[in-house]
Amino acid sequence: MIGNARMSQKYPTSSSRKRSPLSSGKYSAIGLLAYCRPGFEAECAQELQNIASLQFVYGYSKIDKGTGVVFWRCSQGNPLDVYKEIEVSRCIFARQVFCALHDIEIEDTTDRVSPVVEALRPGGAFGFLHIETPLEDEAGSLQKLAKKLTAPMSAALRNAGVLSKAKTDELPQLHLVCLSGQHIIAALAVHPNSSALPLGIPRLRFRNEAPSRSALKIEEAFLTMLTPAEREFVLKRGQRGVDLGAAPGGWTWYMVTQGVKMTAVDHGALQQELLEDPAVTYVSDDGYVYKPQRKVDWVVCDIVDKPKRTMERMADWLCYDWTTYALFNLKLPMKTRMDEVEACLQRLQERLLGADIESEVRVKQLYHDREEVTVLALTGHFLTAFQKH
């Protein structure tokens, strides 16, 4: 936190939450396991290392490019200390993070259960078992293996006292991650350090009346970047908003479904049904030039352009008090993606500080994002309603 601009920390901690299930047993960790968008493994690995460095814990990452999996192996310090300070919803590139306990190589594929039980027997207990794979193969063999292992593995772990007889949130969850038929990583998870969503992915249903699939992107942003209470506070019926670069109207359509009256700004064509909607005002203009006639509650923007240009325009909207909240995407270059994100956030922070605007800024690469990240900027009464320390 710098000055009086309350930007959310790059890697916010979870130390203020209630007593963690991790205090219920003894767990020995070897590192962190994270899932991210395939192709962004290097950025995710850098993010994990940055988080660990804040706790004076160090290690190295094992990356298989294109898999969306990062295994960060600790070489100095306790990775459990790092995991306790992670809140995955505040990570940028990691969509799921576990605390890795054991890296298990299966020598005899006729018995995958015994090596796992033997590795876990000396440690703490778990309240629930998930067997999963983040990897996709054409035959779905790993998914089938995970399903096949669940019943015998659960029974064996219960008999060994590793898994509780009944599901409980009082203990961490055990995740057995199948990276191949002979390679399993045993990891623990507690919420909100880890995502409660399978593989960290929200399962959203595309509605045929939506103008484009980008509607899923903005829906995911509101569902995952805000808590239910926060969402209820900032997104209300009767609000007014502006969608810059709106065509064909996916983001405008979603905001209208939430009861927000929208001004859709674009030289391109809007979906005909939206043009006829009384809650939508269409303005044929450049999204980077348009100025509102009066302050609105929301500005949203998904324009494909250089990230610094988008960020500067969004900073204008916030600093000139044209809007209370902003949700926008930054399209990232093929190289130096982490550097680009950090540079944009630093510049936004400078602009907000210069305008003496207190804010909270959250950044996330969503499942429905591509070569981009989504930024949520919150100002006004939100900051007093949801004090963060």
From Swiss-Prot:
Claim: Transferase is one of the keywords in the record: yes
Location of the protein in the cell: Cytoplasm
Pfam families in alphabetical order: FtsJ, RlmM_FDX, RLMM_N
Compositional bias annotation for Polar residues: 1-13
Record-level Gene Ontology MF annotations: S-adenosylmethionine-dependent methyltransferase activity
Binding site for S-adenosyl-L-methionine: S214, A247, P248, G249, G250, D266, D286, D302
GO biological process: methylation; rRNA processing
Catalytic site: K331 (proton acceptor)
EC number annotated for this UniProt entry: 2.1.1.186
Assembly and oligomerization: Monomer.
Similarity comment: Belongs to the class I-like SAM-binding methyltransferase superfamily. RNA methyltransferase RlmE family. RlmM subfamily.
Protein name: Ribosomal RNA large subunit methyltransferase M
